[in-house]
């Protein structure tokens, strides 16, 4: 090991999500890598970009399902990178769709410890979010996810889901035996993964890092904001139903709803918003405009139907001194203290969300107070310096407590790669 005193040598592995879709995972990877480099550690990225898929040949696209299960290219390229770079630790983030679990075996063969941040539920659920047909579904938790293929849980397609199910089954033992430290981003997410029987001594909970930001002193507008992907699992249909109920309960709504983001519900949201003067849609906006919107809003809405693994936008809002109104389940109940720095509402209940929005309109001073306390929560619980220290502690654990993992591939596929 090169030693933490003189700086660790870290290799970050990540399959990047499409840039057309806002990705909290991409932001976390970038922010952590930058924080490590600023602290004097040597960081190299091993990344594949989903944006490249649209430029592939028809043959390459036809072979993508096989690559989801096992990417020979990633295995070969990472093995070469490990020989040349010789990192102290490899930090694996997302492996779907272009990296695959092949990278775990490459690290095993090079005797380099792996730290894995588990950002979603894909080790158990083909969709990655435990949502099927707009409702929470735990049918595959603790089991092989074959029901995901039956229901076509990924993008509503059995053909698209099948490679994910095969990959999960083929590499489940590898995920259990080739990782030296697992980082879950909330206790709620960790608890749902207990069904995998991961070695408890190697399991850590570490919230995502949010860079320190000076609070912007700007007057608050009569606005509540939604910032994120426009997807059913994120609660967009719930939000639209709740807003209509809020409008129906008041002749003078008093608030506007601003929606920033993109996703599969783009057209549906745009059509709905166009018929409502109180709603504005912005599409994807740059980070500085996101910060400006958060700083001006009276509250940020997080209506997620799925059980969020973390809720990055909640802590970003806290950093801006803005309270959050969030669905009361998953990790969100760990982040928001109702009556102190925000509010929680009954998940999947549009009337409950409408009532919370009406409360913002009726009691702006209360939400100003919540915002001040939200900033205090950010500084006390989500301090980025402490987050970096915790990350380095987990790296050190992985380096000093490596796993051999020998035999994982033989047990799983019957042969060495």
What are these regions (language model features)?
Residues 183, 208, 216-244, 258:
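Conserved donor-binding/catalytic core segment of Leloir-type glycosyltransferases
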Residues 188, 209:
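Carbohydrate-associated surface elements
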Residues 267-288, 292:
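Nucleotide-activated donor-binding/catalytic signature segment of Leloir-type glycosyltransferases, i.e.
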Residues 295-309, 322:
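Acidic donor-binding loop of glycosyltransferase active sites
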Residues 305, 322, 326-333, 347-348:
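Short glycine-rich donor-binding/catalytic loop of glycosyltransferases
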Residues 338-339, 343-350, 359-364:
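Conserved acidic donor-binding segment of nucleotide-sugar-dependent glycosyltransferases
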């Amino acid at each position: 090991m090169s030693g933490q005193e003189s700086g660790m040598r870290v290799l970050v592995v990540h399959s990047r999500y499409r840039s057309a879709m806002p990705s909290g995972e991409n932001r976390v990877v970038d922010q952590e890598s930058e924080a490590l480099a600023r602290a004097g550690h040597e960081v190299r990225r091993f990344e594949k970009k989903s944006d490249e898929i649209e430029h592939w040949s028809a043959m390459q696209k036809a072979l993508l399902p096989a690559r989801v299960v096992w990417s020979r290219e990633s295995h070969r390229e990472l093995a070469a990178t490990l020989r040349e770079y010789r990192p102290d630790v490899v930090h694996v983030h997302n492996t779907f769709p272009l990296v695959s679990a092949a990278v775990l075996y490459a690290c095993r063969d090079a005797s380099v410890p792996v730290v894995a941040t588990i950002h979603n539920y894909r080790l158990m659920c083909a969709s990655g979010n435990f949502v099927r047909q707009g409702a929470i579904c735990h049918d595959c938790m603790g089991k092989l996810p074959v029901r995901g293929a039956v229901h076509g849980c990924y993008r509503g397609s059995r053909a698209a889901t099948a490679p994910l199910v095969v990959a999960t089954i083929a590499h489940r033992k590898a995920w259990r035996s080739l990782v030296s430290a697992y980082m879950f981003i909330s206790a709620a997410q960790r608890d749902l993964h207990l069904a995998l029987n991961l070695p408890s001594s190697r399991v850590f909970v570490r919230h995502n890092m949010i860079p320190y930001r000076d609070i912007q002193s700007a007057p608050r507008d009569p606005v509540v904001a939604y910032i994120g992907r426009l997807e059913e699992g994120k609660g967009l249909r719930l939000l639209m139903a709740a807003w209509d109920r809020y409008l129906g309960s008041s002749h003078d709504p008093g608030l506007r709803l601003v929606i920033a983001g993109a996703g599969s519900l783009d057209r549906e949201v745009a059509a709905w918003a166009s018929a409502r003067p109180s709603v504005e849609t912005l599409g994807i906006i740059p980070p500085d405009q996101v910060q400006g919107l958060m700083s001006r809003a009276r509250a940020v809405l997080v209506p997620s139907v799925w059980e969020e693994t973390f809720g990055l936008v909640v802590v970003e809002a806290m950093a801006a001194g803005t309270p959050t109104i969030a669905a009361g389940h998953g990790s969100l109940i760990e982040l928001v203290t109702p009556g102190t720095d925000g509010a929680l509402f009954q998940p999947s209940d549009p009337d409950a969300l409408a009532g919370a929005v009406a409360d913002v309109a009726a009691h702006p001073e209360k939400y100003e107070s919540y915002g001040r306390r939200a900033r205090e929560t950010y500084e006390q619980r989500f301090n980025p310096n402490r987050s970096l220290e915790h990350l380095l502690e987990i790296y050190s654990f992985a380096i000093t407590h490596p796993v051999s993992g020998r035999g994982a591939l033989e047990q799983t596929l019957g042969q060495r790669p």
